A protein has these predicted regions:
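Bacterial N-terminal signal peptides
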Residues: 7-15
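Intrinsically disordered, low-complexity
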Residues: 20-66, 164-165
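Exported/periplasmic cell-wall-interacting domains
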Residues: 25-26, 67, 80-165
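Well-ordered beta-strand positions in beta-sheet-rich domains
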Residues: 29, 50-52, 75, 114, ...
Length: 165
């Protein structure tokens, strides 16, 4: 009887050690807060992870027109993933909305586009987290390449993105 108890304990220990690790749940929402330079991934109400980010070189205020170097503000969606991005990997954000296009048209300009969450270009990958010391993008949200690899796995196309001032 004692022998069976030890065998059972041994089998339970071995089976739990061999069981695949539980995968992290996927993000259902991304919250980017420009004033704190943070991006938080959520699954429901549960925080999966928060990252420090770099923004466009003119970070205050919402994006209005192409070339203003601002990061947009509003509710968007991840509508594409680009594994061949020149900034390591990238997730395309659905900016501009219909209203943002119309606003740019009224200003006699184009709204711009190609707003992404992305990593670092190969020539600057060595900077790692130092890249966050200054806002340097054309309006995108930048993280390190290691962070982007993690984000890439956690964020499916269709994920909601909220960008706040």
């Amino acid at each position: 009887m004692r022998y069976r108890g030890w065998c059972l304990c041994f089998l339970l220990a071995v089976s739990s050690a061999l069981a695949p690790a539980a995968e992290k749940p996927l993000a259902t929402r991304i919250l980017i807060v420009k004033s704190t330079r943070t991006m938080t991934l959520f699954n429901g109400r549960k925080v999966l992870k928060t990252y420090k980010v770099a923004l466009g070189t003119a970070p205050v205020g919402p994006k209005r027109i192409e070339g203003d170097h601002r990061t947009p503000e509003g509710i968007y969606t991840i509508d594409a993933k680009n594994p061949q991005s020149r900034f390591h990997l990238s997730l395309h954000i659905s900016y501009p909305s219909v209203a943002e296009r119309e606003q740019a048209r009224r200003l006699g300009a184009r709204p711009g586009g190609a707003i992404m969450i992305h990593g670092l270009a190969p020539d600057f990958a060595y900077l790692g987290p130092l890249h966050r010391k200054v806002d340097w993008t054309d309006g995108c949200i930048a993280v390190t390449n290691a962070e982007m690899e993690e984000i890439w796995k956690l964020v499916p196309v269709g994920t909601r993105v909220e960008i706040r001032p």
